[in-house]
Amino acid sequence: MLAKRIIPCLDVTNGRVVKGVNFVELRDAGDPVEIARRYDEQGADEITFLDITATSDGRDLILHIIEAVASQVFIPLTVGGGVRALEDVRRLLNAGADKISMNSSAVANPQLVSDASARHGAQCIVVAIDAKKVSADGEPPRWEVFTHGGRKATGLDAVAWAREMARRGAGEILLTSMDRDGTKSGFDLELTRAVSDAVPVPVIASGGVGNLQHLADGIKLGHADAVLAASIFHYGEHTVGEAKRFMAQQDIPVRM
């Protein structure tokens, strides 16, 4: 069984790391280079950087931050936010990113995922899906895809969309539950399991981690291949090392 990954997520806006609840109420968590270096030292498997307002504000890529981080951090970096064209993918990879995450742009232009995967390889293309439950209690569960930092409904079914993105060459799906984001109440395990079981590529569970048990649940009950968290790491509640030791105690294979 492949080792399961623990991935701290850095949401960046205006050059600072921030964290919100349900995609709003952002508070400052510090300098991206310092925070990334700390996670590297703690033994994180990867780091994900999301420029959370680039697409909605129409801003350019955070190349200078990526260059600064890549020069000091030696684990894989996934970068997303403001990726609109094949040229953006190339520029971010050249700046030191290892994987590129697309969200709004994949919905606007699914061919971009196919083209980027064909040119650079599926292993460096991640499609991020922000999903919100839209079915009522008692109905079969259904989740809708949202874009533009969770501000725009698309009408797309999250499970079907994940399948389509994998078919087009996404090497990985980064799945965030908007209902759980920042709530510390645990992953939406039903959503995570539905997508993980539907696609042939790794799924990273995101949104809602409040304790170490939630991370383990994402793997064991959500069938995710990796778990992503922000709040519990940024504000010093837990280190990545503590998370890995906890998961190892639950017989989840991790790189120590």
UniProtKB/Swiss-Prot annotation:
An example Gene Ontology biological process: L-histidine biosynthetic process
E.C. no: 4.3.2.10
Residues spanning the signal sequence: none
Any coiled-coil regions, as ranges: none
Single annotated GO MF: lyase activity
Transmembrane residue ranges: none
Domain of life: Bacteria
Pathway(s) the chain acts in: Amino-acid biosynthesis; L-histidine biosynthesis; L-histidine from 5-phospho-alpha-D-ribose 1-diphosphate: step 5/9
Keywords, comma-separated and alphabetical: Amino-acid biosynthesis, Cytoplasm, Histidine biosynthesis, Lyase
Active site per the UniProt annotation: 11, 130
GO CC annotations, alphabetized: cytoplasm
Assembly, per entry: Heterodimer of HisH and HisF.
Similarity comment text for this entry: Belongs to the HisA/HisF family.
Record's function text: IGPS catalyzes the conversion of PRFAR and glutamine to IGP, AICAR and glutamate. The HisF subunit catalyzes the cyclization activity that produces IGP and AICAR from PRFAR using the ammonia provided by the HisH subunit.
NCBIfam families associated with the record: hisF
Name by which UniProt lists this protein: Imidazole glycerol phosphate synthase subunit HisF
Organism: Ralstonia nicotianae (strain ATCC BAA-1114 / GMI1000)
Gene from which this protein is expressed: hisF
